[in-house]
Amino acid sequence: MSSEPTNPSASREAAHNAPTEVQPPKGIGAMAGAMFLMATSAIGPGFLTQTSVFTVQMGAAFAFAIALSIIVDIAIQLNVWRVLAISGMRANELGNTVLPGLGWFLAILVFIGGMVFNIGNIAGSGLGLNAMLGIDARIGGLIASAIAIFIFLSKRAGVALDRIVAALGAIMILLMLYVAIVSQPPVGEALKNTVMPESVDFFVITTLIGGTVGGYITFAGAHRLIDSGLSGPENVNAITKTSVLGIIITGIMRVLLFLAVLGVVSTGVALSEDNTACLLYTS
């Protein structure tokens, strides 16, 4: 009667590692989190104001500017995300590799820009709560800031962020779709101007591009992929898909907002100077 020696620690290790091999959902969650983080970073108060004001200024011809900016946005973001995520290095790390000190200079610029943009985001969240609940915009900004701080203080902030931005992004698109349908915009005129615009303003196009992939916005999604471990040449297809889908989500939101505003202003309603976003939900 023979008995083979056993290694209890090896058995325990094998038993412990067996259930952890189911990784696809985590990868999918990281991809969704990255693209929605990028998209929701782009869709802020400036995004709403730009789209609303430019729609009033240009009318249906603004459709061409949106279409062209989406194409350019895809090219820019695809390039940035591939370089960063495939290398597995954040923008400042890669910059220091190319030229010592360049990464720190880039980080300072992004930090300054991020501070300015997030002051606007806090103000925008306050205006949003003011539009929904009628509370003072300053109190609304404090409430939104407290919620954000609570999320980032969590030990599972990364997982929470992936789920929260994906859920809120989907809700935001559905709400804007509803408003776009209810406002009954002249869709035929918008489609015609997409390929045959009545006027072209390259300043507007440049502004849209900067508001979508400028500053920290495009870095946010790429860095989220790196943080989640979705990097390296072997993940190039997932990186590419996530990059393009992030821009498409932003583009869908801009198109829906454009149609909603176009439908409202085509009836002769004037924009509110104090809270532009409130116009769509109160008209």
Where are these regions (language model features)?
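Membrane-interface "cap" regions at the ends of multi-pass membrane proteins
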Residues: 1-47, 204-205, 231-245
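Hydrophobic, small-residue-rich membrane helices and short re-entrant helix-turn-helix hairpins
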Residues: 50-55, 160, 217-252, 267-277
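Hydrophobic alpha-helical segments and their helix-loop junctions in multi-pass secondary transporters
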Residues: 169-195, 205-223, 260-262
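Conserved small/polar residues in nucleotide/adenosyl-binding loops
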Residues: 281-282
